[in-house]
Amino acid sequence: MAAPDGRVVSRPQRLGQGSGQGPKGSGACLHPLDSLEQKETQEQTSGQLVMLRKAQEFFQTCDAEGKGFIARKDMQRLHKELPLSLEELEDVFDALDADGNGYLTPQEFTTGFSHFFFSQNNPSQEDAGEQVAQRHEEKVYLSRGDEDLGDMGEDEEAQFRMLMDRLGAQKVLEDESDVKQLWLQLKKEEPHLLSNFEDFLTRIISQLQEAHEEKNELECALKRKIAAYDEEIQHLYEEMEQQIKSEKEQFLLKDTERFQARSQELEQKLLCKEQELEQLTQKQKRLEGQCTALHHDKHETKAENTKLKLTNQELARELERTSWELQDAQQQLESLQQEACKLHQEKEMEVYRVTESLQREKAGLLKQLDFLRERNKHLRDERDICFQKNKAAKANTAASRASWKKRSGSVIGKYVDSRGILRSQSEEEEEVFGIPRRSSLGLSGYPLTEEEPGTGEPGPGGPYPRPLRRIISVEEDPLPQLLDGGFEQPLSKCSEEEEVSDQGVQGQIPEAPPLKLTPTSPRGQPVGKEALCKEESSPSAPDRLFKIVFVGNSAVGKTSFLRRFCEDRFSPGMAATVGIDYRVKTLNVDNSQVALQLWDTAGQERYRCITQQFFRKADGVIVMYDLTDKQSFLSVRRWLSSVEEAVGDRVPVLLLGNKLDNEKEREVPRGLGEQLATENNLIFYECSAYSGHNTKESLLHLARFLKEQEDTVREDTIQVGHPAKKKSCCG
């Protein structure tokens, strides 16, 4: 039955039960309502507790600083917690601040917030009261209905049965208790609706009867369909059995054939397996024999292992002893290396001191050389005066030649001879120290002819060819000879007391014999190993002389390159060059004899200042790097900077990449060298001192370039004007 609030309330017992069960049913209905009221009370109490906790949480949110009270601005922090605007939150704060002091304590906030919340929820509480009242009325109504059902009479039961029989409801309704209960309730409470209810039952029962008839018809049709389906299925089963039987016979036939073929195949396999078994048996016997032999070998190996372990222990002890000895030897070797290093340093210092002393001695000798040149000039003047006096005496003393007496005195020939000796000695000094004499050496490196004083014409001495020699190499040459050497015939030993005959003087004066430039005494051993290059050109003096300086890092192959170029041979294991060394090589360049003075410089850092001094007088520079050493190529720019600082860009530079024969270990590609040469306007070649590849070609290219450059300079000089002839130092 529907309750006044729209809810459907189920009855506690079904219709048709005894009337004595009515009080139990009403009690069952009252008990849940009482429990519902208690539950609502508990829910209300728990809601109040939840609100108190929520109010405390809101207070803590507002009082983030822990002051113990909240102000009006702190109330705005609840904007994210509650669906209220800032103005509404301020209104709530004003409502909670009853005393108007501008802040709220925890007690005021909790009490006021709870009161505010419950005041907002009063309408819902009133609705809950109305629901409780409705539930009470429903409870009373249900209890009364149960009492009325208990007082139903037998006549009403008979009338209900007659109605059901008239309608034929027994065939349709299985349980009439619910309909009976509704009919009795309508008859007692609202009898005017009873006829409508009976009409409703009549229509319902007639519809149910029609539905029952349709159901029976459908069941009959379904049974007929099932029978036809069963017959068809039976027919299909029979056909399938026939097919299965035929297929089974065919399968058995094929299976028999397969079985026979399989049997034959298995028999053959069995024979093969038996043969394999025999082979395996034989192999097993053979393996057993090998296993037995291996066991014997194992025992022997164990014995050998035992011996080897003992031997290994002995060797380990010997190794340990050897290692101790090796450590001692290494310590001794380190001490020897340290001593060798000290000796090397001392040797270098000694070499430096000797070199410095040589420089000082060189300066002293240069001063002596200047003095001797002045003396030579004075002697030439005296010789001219003697010539004039002799001519006058010849005219005055022609009558008294027979009575000419012999006298002793100085003869100009003595001075001339001594001057030749002095000149020879000065030239020897220049050979030792590698100092070119600008007044007596030509472009080719050979001395010019002797000139008469003041005229610039060649003297009677003629040319004095002398091959160029290289400077001292401190590493290769012993130095004590320099300290022991000296002049064999100093100026003070020139004799002036020789007597000559009358006729001898007359013969000497008009003829003016040539000056003797060869020293009267043999020379001492020159300092250093002065190796000469093979002269490939004609014995005549070269037309040009160019000074070329080799630079580059140590061990790039400069000395080996020079030896290959000059001597056409390669000497492995050469030591590094110390100081400066040079060689001379004459080439035929375009039908012209060109002498190349090749200066080999040391690549070590400590000789850098010495190397830079030779750039100033160089006609060309060759910068060499190692193709197998990238660091030597990286140092090329530094060498080019040194050359540019010393001579600028007026000197042509040849960039050589050595060790082309060692192509497998190449670290510098050819493209990098070509790029560097293009950027700095250099001549670029890759060569090999070991095989001689591009050694002559590269220097021939540089010599031709220097010759063309000098020809260009000469042509420009001729166009400007002929320069005045240089006077000799003695003129």
Curated annotation (Swiss-Prot):
SMART domains according to UniProt: ARF, EFh, RAB, RAN, RAS, RHO
Residue numbers spanned by region Switch-I: 572-580
Covalently attached lipid (S-geranylgeranyl cysteine), positions: 729
Cofactor(s), by name: Mg(2+)
Binding locations of Mg(2+): 559, 577, 600
PROSITE patterns registered for this protein in UniProt: EF_HAND_1, EF_HAND_2, RAB
Renumbered residue ranges of the record's region Proline-rich domain (PRD) which mediates interaction with VAV1: 349-540
EC number: 3.6.5.2
Binding site for GTP: 554, 556-560, 571-572, 577, 603, 658-659, 661, 689
Keyword Transport: yes
Coiled-coil annotated spans: 201-382
InterPro entries recorded: EF-hand-dom_pair (IPR011992), EF_Hand_1_Ca_BS (IPR018247), EF_hand_dom (IPR002048), P-loop_NTPase (IPR027417), Rab (IPR050227), Small_GTP-bd (IPR005225), Small_GTPase (IPR001806)
Residue ranges annotated for the EF-hand domain, each copy included: 84-119
One GO-annotated biological process of the protein: adaptive immune response
Effect of residue 658 to I: GTP/GDP-binding defective mutant with reduced GTPase activity and protein stability. Failure to localize to the microtubule organizing center and Golgi apparatus membrane, instead shows a predominant localization to the cytoplasm
Keywords: Adaptive immunity, Calcium, Calcium transport, Cell membrane, Coiled coil, Cytoplasm, Cytoskeleton, Golgi apparatus, GTP-binding, Hydrolase, Immunity, Ion transport, Lipoprotein, Magnesium, Membrane, Metal-binding, Nucleotide-binding, Prenylation, Repeat, Transport
Chain intervals for the UniProt region annotation (Switch-II): 603-619
Disordered: region residues: 1-45, 426-466, 494-528
Stated consequence of mutating residue 63 to A: Loss of calcium-binding and interaction with the dynein-dynactin complex
Binding site for Ca(2+): 97, 99, 101, 103, 108
Family of the protein in this entry: Belongs to the EFCAB4 family.
Protein name (database record): EF-hand calcium-binding domain-containing protein 4B
UniProt lineage: Eukaryota, Metazoa, Chordata, Craniata, Vertebrata
Annotated gene: CRACR2A
